[in-house]
């Protein structure tokens, strides 16, 4: 068979070409979806119903990625972003979308993913719960600010990482951070730039707790006494609980000053008011960033799990006891299991502080089979709140224990959908599913699903 030369497509021309596309929907990561020559095209920054001029940035066999050049026809759900750093800072990616439209999209994306990626049939509308929603702005009670020392200018940058980059975007305020923490950013940056050892500063972790605002400053070297005095004065002026953290993770409290001989630092804490529980935590411990939504989420989890006075409940990936402690007020016994030893120790202390003697915490490898552990025993109900990777390994042995109800809290609907298949194949059905709008202005989806054992 004769062979003829065929010129290969010019990829640089394909990528540089601009074209007009119509957006039909958003994917679960918040990117717009359009079609071009039989390919799906993903376009960040656009909304369903819009026509946009775009430029390809990546071409694959079955899909392409493009960047937005301009909006030709705008959606009624498009709004002006609140933040001057939007699309530079990597924190928010949906500020251009009306808040109610964001929630509708997330709820739809959640249900679609569970239907498509798990073995579930179409999710009936009557088991889709109303989304848990709260304030759209100034909702974050915690943030980590990155620092970068510029040797040329001798200035310290303070801000957030740019999207998909290590570059730091200097910021003056943040509209999703609590107002009191947002107001600290500019004076904090100015203060840190007055230090002699500013090149030795790492990130800054800001936390708004029920007992005040906290700042933990990472340092790579011991600071001179003049810098300590300067930082202490700043903390006193702003009534800020200020701690230093060295490379070994050791914390030193600068303000308020500790009494002579007292080494116990003041820890931030939050209350779960409905359950009259107080949760203390240390820097590095995971806590939900949205306090109001966390309270509503805990309330709904308890309502769905419906703990009874004679039941034993397992809380896997329990953290510092966010669910375990309030569950212990209703159940006969709660067992909390966590993979991070420091959080297990804090959870144990929280149980003591709340005078709860029917909750026990254990440190374990959460990817291992724990069914043979003598402390586990019979489990009546189960609560899971894993990290983004999900709980696939844990469910291999958990489903054999056949708890009557399982409440699965997830920050990744894709791993939630995958894990749902394990439970559905083990005799469970989805009884409730709902969005938890933990992260407004971002594409991130928090969700809760109730599984019930078919009897």
From Swiss-Prot:
PROSITE patterns for this protein: SAM_MT_RNA_M5U (PS51687), TRAM (PS50926), TRMA_1 (PS01230), TRMA_2 (PS01231)
Record keywords: 4Fe-4S, Iron, Iron-sulfur, Metal-binding, Methyltransferase, rRNA processing, S-adenosyl-L-methionine, Transferase
Residue numbers annotated as active site: 411 (nucleophile)
Highest taxon in the source lineage: Bacteria
GO biological process annotation, one example: rRNA base methylation
Family matches, as InterPro entries: 23S_rRNA_MeTrfase_RlmD, MeTrfase_TrmA_AS, MeTrfase_TrmA_CS, NA-bd_OB-fold, SAM-dependent_MTases_sf, TRAM_dom, U5_MeTrfase_fam
Iron-sulfur as UniProt keyword: yes
Binding site for [4Fe-4S] cluster: 83, 89, 92, 174
Keyword Cell wall biogenesis/degradation: no
Annotated EC: 2.1.1.190
Pfam families, A to Z: TRAM, tRNA_U5-meth_tr
UniProt cross-references to HAMAP family, sorted A to Z: 23SrRNA_methyltr_RlmD (MF_01010)
Record protein name field: 23S rRNA (uracil(1939)-C(5))-methyltransferase RlmD
Gene: rlmD
